[in-house]
């Protein structure tokens, strides 16, 4: 599929308090049309700075930007991209933010209509003209229905909940039929329930409109809910990027693993083991295993297989299965009991089946 966003070897530098700061360093990111692409990192990682180069709200120092096949920035071969051309380009990229930036003195309806005040369309002769008042009103009405706010059109921002305010911001961001929607920490100010509702809305809009979504966040749970691809940033650099499924199945960087652990109930269970006597109570011929598996592996009776093949017994302490992009991912925490030879054979079987596992409680003495 064709990339709608190409950021090639981008660097962003600026002076702050008398020193040169490199906010983004040699970052390359290609986002395909129709992606929901999560860019995750802690505060100061450079993720917002990077993504704001997409519509040139932040001008890079070095590198190249190509949007929908059009080069809009090239540090080696400068591109003239200013004035009316830049304004028209930016209309095709919607943005929502952590803070909703609504106009307090305007109604919900007029907040959305505000984004249409300079909007133009082509007439049947190919000439551009401004929208009529009726066309603007019809467009706003359509957008408010799309974000489930049709019955709140005459309300003011002060009368709305946080989730409703963000819905207004989303409607406003969609006013000019953008091909790209950027969410810059768009759920950070919301409670968990409202966050899920907004993510469901973004997913629905993505499906209905075919819009490409770029999701900036410091929360892996947000990425996990709706993204199909992920880039992880640290200290201005993209340290890892892949499909959501591959990131969760085979994370390479320590930071990526940390982010994944924040979304995993199995990791919370493992962390709680230190407060129990479970590890101390393991028999001499048993050990505690954490096992991860995904996709077709879930269809195979792995635990049943090892008990039959290798003369070991198991006791499951924890189990969980969840879906990522429609693909199941599972975790087990279980004891493996048997002779050292048989336990070693069972673990070799895990390796043979390409299952990820770790020994949580490893014994020093075995009884054969």
Swiss-Prot record:
Give the highest taxon in the source lineage.
Bacteria
Q: Which reaction does it catalyse?
A: L-methionine(out) + ATP + H2O = L-methionine(in) + ADP + phosphate + H(+); D-methionine(out) + ATP + H2O = D-methionine(in) + ADP + phosphate + H(+)
For this record, the Gene Ontology CC terms, alphabetical, are: plasma membrane
User: Which controlled-vocabulary keywords does the entry list?
Assistant: Amino-acid transport, ATP-binding, Cell membrane, Membrane, Nucleotide-binding, Translocase, Transport
InterPro entries from the entry?
A: AAA+_ATPase, ABC_transporter-like_ATP-bd, ABC_transporter-like_CS, ACT-like_dom_sf, MetN_ABC, MetN_ABC_transporter-like, NIL_domain, P-loop_NTPase
The UniProt entry, under Pfam families, shows: ABC_tran, NIL
Question: What residue ranges carry the coiled-coil annotation?
Answer: none
Q: Which cellular compartments is it found in?
A: Cell membrane
ABC transporter domain location: 5-260
**What's its membrane topology?**
Peripheral membrane protein
List ligand-binding residues for ATP.
Answer: 41-48
Q: Which molecular-function annotation in GO is an example for this chain?
A: ATP hydrolysis activity
Its Enzyme Commission number(s) read 7.4.2.11
Recorded hits in Gene3D superfamilies, A to Z, give: 3.30.70.260, P-loop containing nucleotide triphosphate hydrolases
Q: Say which enzyme class the record assigns.
A: translocase
Say which family it is in.
Answer: Belongs to the ABC transporter superfamily. Methionine importer (TC 3.A.1.24) family.
Briefly, what is this protein's role? Part of the ABC transporter complex MetNIQ involved in methionine import. Responsible for energy coupling to the transport system.
Outline the subunit composition: The complex is composed of two ATP-binding proteins (MetN), two transmembrane proteins (MetI) and a solute-binding protein (MetQ).
Name the record gives this protein:
Methionine import ATP-binding protein MetN
**Origin organism lineage:** Bacteria, Bacillati, Bacillota, Bacilli, Lactobacillales
């Amino acid at each position: 599929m064709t990339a709608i966003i190409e950021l090639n070897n981008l660097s962003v530098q600026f002076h702050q308090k008398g020193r040169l700061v490199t906010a983004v360093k040699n970052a390359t990111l290609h986002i395909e049309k129709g992606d929901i692409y999560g860019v995750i990192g802690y505060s100061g990682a450079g993720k917002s700075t990077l993504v704001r180069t997409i519509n040139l709200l932040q001008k890079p120092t070095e590198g190249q930007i190509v949007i929908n096949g059009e080069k809009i920035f090239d540090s080696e071969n400068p591109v003239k991209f200013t004035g009316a051309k830049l304004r028209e380009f930016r209309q095709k990229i919607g943005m929502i933010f952590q803070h909703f930036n609504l106009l307090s003195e305007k109604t919900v309806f007029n907040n959305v209509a505000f984004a249409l005040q300079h909007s133009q369309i082509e007439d049947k002769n190919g000439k551009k003209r401004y929208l009529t008042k009726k066309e603007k009103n019809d467009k706003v009405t359509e957008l408010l229905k799309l974000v489930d706010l049709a019955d709140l059109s005459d309300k003011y921002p002060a009368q709305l909940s946080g989730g409703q305010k963000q819905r207004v911001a989303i409607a406003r961001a969609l006013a000019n039929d953008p091909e790209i929607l950027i969410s810059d920490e768009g759920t950070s100010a919301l409670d968990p329930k409202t966050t899920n509702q907004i993510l469901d809305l973004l997913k629905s809009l993505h499906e209905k409109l075919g819009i490409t979504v770029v999701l900036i966040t410091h929360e892996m749970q947000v990425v996990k809910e709706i993204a199909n691809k992920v880039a992880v940033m640290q200290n201005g650099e993209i340290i890892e990027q892949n499909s959501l499924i591959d990131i969760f199945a085979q994370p390479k960087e320590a930071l990526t693993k940390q982010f994944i652990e924040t979304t995993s109930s199995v990791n919370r269970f493992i962390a709680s083991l230190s407060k129990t006597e479970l590890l101390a109570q393991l028999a001499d011929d048993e050990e505690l295993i954490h096992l991860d598996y995904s996709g077709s592996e879930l269809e195979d009776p792995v635990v049943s297989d090892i008990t039959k093949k290798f003369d070991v017994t198991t006791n499951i302490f924890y189990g969980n299965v969840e879906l990522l992009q429609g693909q199941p991912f599972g975790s087990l925490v279980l004891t493996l009991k048997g002779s050292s030879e048989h336990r070693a054979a069972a673990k070799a079987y895990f390796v043979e089946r390409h299952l990820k596992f770790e020994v949580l409680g490893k014994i020093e003495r075995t009884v054969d």
